[in-house]
Each structure stands twice: as C-alpha cells, then as structure tokens.
C-alpha cells in the first residue's frame, strides 16, 4: 500500500468523508488545507440524477460565473469580414480562417477556447481530429458556434465555464481560485447550480442534483450541504 504523504494525512484527519459541510465551513476547510506552492483552483463535482447512457439525459452547456474563474484565457476565433474585426476588438488573441487552420495543423495550439461563426465551420470541420480530443471543438450547445462571435469572446474572457457530464453522470468544472473571497466562491457555485437546474433534461426523474463536492487542485473532496446554498437545486 502506498505511503500517505504528510499533506494527505492532514487532509484525511481534517475532512470527514461521511459529512456534508455547510458551504462556508467547506470553503474555510479548503483554504486551510491549500498548502501547495501555487494558487490552487477550486473545482466542483456535481453528481446528477441522470442516466448518462441515454443521450437525451446528457447535460451539456456553459455559463458565465459572476466572479470569473481567476484564469486568463486565450481565445482563437474562426470567422471573417466584420466578424473578424469584432472578435479582435472583443479581445481574441487569434482570428482567421484557413490561415488559422494551417497553424493548428502544424501543432500551434496556443489557446484555451475556440469559437467559430457558422460560416466558418466548413474550415473548422477539418480540424475535428485535432480539436476534438482536447475538448476544443466549437459546439453550438456551449455557445462556441455563434453568429455573435464578439459576445462569445467576451463571455470566455469573463470567466465562462463549459460543463458536460461524464459517463457516470458527474459534472466536473472549476469555480475559481482558492484565494478568492469565500462569498465569491459561494456565489460562483450557486450560479453553476442554477445553470445546471435550467439544463435539467425533461426525462430525468427523481432527485436531480444528488451530491455537490468541492476540492482544490491538490486536495480531497469536501461534500457540501445544499441546504446552505441559494440555488436549492432539487
């Protein structure tokens, strides 16, 4: 059996795996235990009451968190004409069509988000094998294929998170950095849960949001009592 590091021993001693913590207590615990030498992200796992094997129960979308994620995001946009100028004005780092596709084919991938106007999808479609496995393929369901590319760029820069359930029906995403004020982390979590509620598949039965856990990049998960959140999610 692998030997536990001192840090993991402390986490195990402090975190009661059987308990659901009040959100304020949970955040305080994460802050106390975040001792990595970098500013850790605060991640969330939301267990949904869906059957992930059924395509009509899968949950996918995007929402802008009120306080952002604390990450600086580089955006690439496939578009042309007036839309290209609008994308640049909104802050996109890379804007183009075939020229941008050629850069990507050469392995130049210096961006975090890819956005495309509908007329550019004929170009983006050639890049599925490159962008798809990295989770970067533009998709209308998460607002990254849109005629209004400038708004999509602004959303990406403002701290938009994209979410999609995994095969176990769990959503994994980030809600900020551990050095955020506790209130900002709480409000970001509440905003995410509200977005997930709006995205609830009509076919999903029973309790929809079954469990919410938050963790830091290097830390253990802390289960959160939903009763203390202003996003009563069932």
Curated annotation (Swiss-Prot):
GO molecular function, one term: structural constituent of ribosome
CDD domains the record matches: Ribosomal_L1
Cellular component terms per the entry's GO annotation: cytosolic large ribosomal subunit
Keywords: Repressor, Ribonucleoprotein, Ribosomal protein, RNA-binding, rRNA-binding, Translation regulation, tRNA-binding
This protein's record includes keyword Secreted: no
Keyword Repressor: yes
An annotated GO BP: translation
Signal peptide, first to last residue: none
Disulfide bonds: none
PANTHER family in the cross-refs: 54S RIBOSOMAL PROTEIN L1, MITOCHONDRIAL, LARGE RIBOSOMAL SUBUNIT PROTEIN UL1M
Assembly and oligomerization: Part of the 50S ribosomal subunit.
UniProt record similarity statement: Belongs to the universal ribosomal protein uL1 family.
NCBIfam families: rplA_bact
Function statement: Binds directly to 23S rRNA. The L1 stalk is quite mobile in the ribosome, and is involved in E site tRNA release.
Name under which the protein is recorded: Large ribosomal subunit protein uL1
Organism: Klebsiella pneumoniae subsp. pneumoniae (strain ATCC 700721 / MGH 78578)
Gene that encodes it: rplA
């Amino acid at each position: 059996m692998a030997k536990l590091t001192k840090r993991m021993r402390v986490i195990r001693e402090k975190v009661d795996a059987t308990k659901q913590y009040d959100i304020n207590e949970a955040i305080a615990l994460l802050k106390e235990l975040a001792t990595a030498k970098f500013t850790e992200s605060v991640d969330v796992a939301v267990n949904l009451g869906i059957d992930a094997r059924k395509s009509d129960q899968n949950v996918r979308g995007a929402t802008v968190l009120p306080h952002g994620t604390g990450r600086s995001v580089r955006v690439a946009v496939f578009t042309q004409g007036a839309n290209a100028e609008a994308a640049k004005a909104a802050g996109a780092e890379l804007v183009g069509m075939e020229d941008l596709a050629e850069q990507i084919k050469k392995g130049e991938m210096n961006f975090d988000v890819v956005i495309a106007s509908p007329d550019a999808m004929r170009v983006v479609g050639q890049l599925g094998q490159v962008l798809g496995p990295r989770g970067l393929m533009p998709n209308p369901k998460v607002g990254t294929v849109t005629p209004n590319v400038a708004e999509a760029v602004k959303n990406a820069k403002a701290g938009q998170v994209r979410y999609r359930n995994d095969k176990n029906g769990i959503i994994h995403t980030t809600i900020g950095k551990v050095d955020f004020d506790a209130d900002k982390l709480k409000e970001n979590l509440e905003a995410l849960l509200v977005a997930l509620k709006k995205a609830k598949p009509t076919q999903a039965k029973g309790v929809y949001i079954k469990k919410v856990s938050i963790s830091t990049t290097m830390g253990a998960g802390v289960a959160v009592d939903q009763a203390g959140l202003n996003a009563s999610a069932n």
